[in-house]
């Protein structure tokens, strides 16, 4: 005795979609156990269907639980076996299922993953719904439910309608651990399923839609590289002469253009520019030189420690040269000094003040002149002694 099942063309073979956790853990172990249990249940259902078919038409209790129809049991076994085979390392397109089957395949937040018995029952219910729809010639009660299940995946509906069957995509098709099914809520079992694209073109469109693969433009990379070289290495690969400098500081070109007329080598100089105005540089330098508006005179290098002594710029210049310039005395001054020296070679304090007032010389100058005059006279006397 043989049994055959004719499925309606718009009903696709129901499969189960499992999502593997990248990190492993309890969820992955539980799913592996459930898949093994589903495979065992599928094998038991197939054996029961074969025994019932070979025993003269008496159905097995497992087949009777599926509705007493051998074709339904065989379809359930085939569906469970296909689910067990396609779940590992594959992500297949979920078929539109009945409400009961859909609730069996998906787990709500806070609930444990479906067990092996629940998976087998869901597969049997889906096969029974498919058989009922095919025998009645219409969508049956599962038609609206299938439409609602198909509406749940609105982003991928176009890709699902363009295919005639489930297209399996390998694990890691879109990259390292990328899943097009987003997790809803903090619970690891709260999963929102989404249909997979069925062809290569649809897969590419799906990746373009849900993955941001567009990188920065080549111009942006080149401009960033030029800016990096300009500010950190000092080489300008283009006319970067209108950039905005940092507030309070300026960039001065220290070397003329090396690569061409529109290129220059810049080295940032930390100079405050509160009171600076730009001056154009000659010789075609691509830049500006900043000079202070008001050139303040530098302070004198030497200042007297005495409060009554006032330093002059001429004195400062003389001290910078190391020796004050010799000022020759006038004939009137020399005549007055020689007259007083002839009277007395050593000058007194009162005479020094009087000579200083008469000759318009300082007392120190008068004293030094008398000292030098005595030394000169001594030299002349010594020379006369040596010659005679």
From Swiss-Prot:
Pfam families: Homeodomain, HoxA13_N. PROSITE patterns: HOMEOBOX_1, HOMEOBOX_2. It is found in: Nucleus. Its main location: nucleus. The keyword DNA-binding applies. Residues 322-381 bind DNA. The keyword Cell membrane does not apply. GO terms for molecular function: DNA binding; DNA-binding transcription activator activity, RNA polymerase II-specific; DNA-binding transcription factor activity, RNA polymerase II-specific; RNA polymerase II cis-regulatory region sequence-specific DNA binding; sequence-specific DNA binding; sequence-specific double-stranded DNA binding. GO terms for cellular component: chromatin; chromosome; intermediate filament cytoskeleton; nucleoplasm. Changing residue 368 to F: In HFG; severe phenotype overlapping with Guttmacher syndrome. InterPro entries: AP_axis_regulatory_Homeobox (IPR051003), HD (IPR001356), Homeobox_CS (IPR017970), Homeodomain-like_sf (IPR009057), HoxA13_N (IPR022067). SMART domains: HOX. Keywords: Developmental protein, Disease variant, DNA-binding, Homeobox, Nucleus, Transcription, Transcription regulation. One of its GO terms (biological process) is tissue homeostasis. It is linked to Hand-foot-genital syndrome: A disorder characterized by limb and genitourinary anomalies. Clinical features include small feet with unusually short great toes and abnormal thumbs. Females with the disorder have duplication of the genital tract. Guttmacher syndrome: Dominantly inherited combination of distal limb and genital tract abnormalities. It has several features in common with hand-foot-genital syndrome, including hypoplastic first digits and hypospadias. Typical features not seen in hand-foot-genital syndrome include postaxial polydactyly of the hands and uniphalangeal second toes with absent nails. Belongs to the Abd-B homeobox family. Binds DNA as a homodimer. Interacts with MEIS1, MEIS2 and MEIS3. Sequence-specific, AT-rich binding transcription factor which is part of a developmental regulatory system that provides cells with specific positional identities on the anterior-posterior axis. Sequence-specific transcription factor which is part of a developmental regulatory system that provides cells with specific positional identities on the anterior-posterior axis. This is Homeobox protein Hox-A13. It comes from Homo sapiens. The lineage of its organism: Eukaryota, Metazoa, Chordata, Craniata, Vertebrata.
